[in-house]
Amino acid sequence: MFSGAVLYSEKLQLPGIEIMKPIFLAVFCILVPVSCTPSAGISVPNLSTPSSLEESQILFDDFSYSTIDEMTYNGWVVRSGSGWPGVTGATFRPENVSFLDYPDPADNRLLRMTSSTDGTAENTYQTQICHQRKYMEGTYAARVRFSDQPVSGVDGDQVVQTFYTITPYIEPLAPDYSELDYEYLPNGGWGSGDLTFYVTTWETVQIEPRNADNTSSSVQGSLAGWHTLVTQVTGGTVRYFVDGQLIAQHGGEYYPDAPMSINFNLWFIDGGLVQVEGLREYQEDIDWVFHQAGIALMPEEVEAAVARMRRQSIKFRDTVPAKVPALVSPCNF
């Protein structure tokens, strides 16, 4: 449900994908993040790039790990226990995170999240990783692999494959809540059809009863395979890119208010499990993640920065200072 009215819409194009971009829409959404869209006039900023990566505040992780302990040493938390989001009664399980060789480029490794269900809450296992809460304005990017079907078992569960930044959920409708989402729903959900991709920027939220104040844009069509996701957060505007193409621009009251953590998760929508017997497993792969503080980099600049660090055999770099005092960084939302 939402309030507002679309006057008319126009189409943007990704290869094989159609994007509907309404030109005017009231921007307060309730219950599900499916109805609000960017304001008219998507634009690209004037950019200012530092003279070298060494002078910048950067997070880069190539996920070239062998164990979870190596990953947590570099500031990551692998979630355990239960809680939002996902199926009520499901469990977030650290052993769902694994690392494997991927020869593109040569000698590369990646992180894999595997989530599974048999249609019951007690046998539903979800996955989430979180980095420290110290990121605000600048550029966020990740190279991820989405999938349209489970790797085993029957298809149809409403699974959500993500890359996002977020503040902790402290209280309902907190004024300093912030969240920026990429969410791929190959089997639909939240009232959408199959193969729906959302980018959503949040002002605030209340979990129970559900009250979500956000603005969201959607893409229809398969995004199975590898994609580079880039978010620019500067000058009061949030811009979302997929594979170099600008697909949405949000701002105004939805612009982030507070430092966020960087997260990935793979979870199932509550009430969206197929009620058939048998285990099914879904996967999302992550090649790398990148953040440049304070500066809007274009996707090609991000790719160049990542390529440069790889040529220098840099597997991990974190020169983004923690806040003083350090902010609490729960991995539970």
How should these model regions be labeled?
Residues 63, 140-142, 225-233, 238-240:
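Short tryptophan-centered beta-strand motifs in secreted/extracellular beta-sheet-rich domains
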Residues 171-228:
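Glycine-aromatic-enriched beta-strand/loop faces of beta-sandwich-type recognition domains
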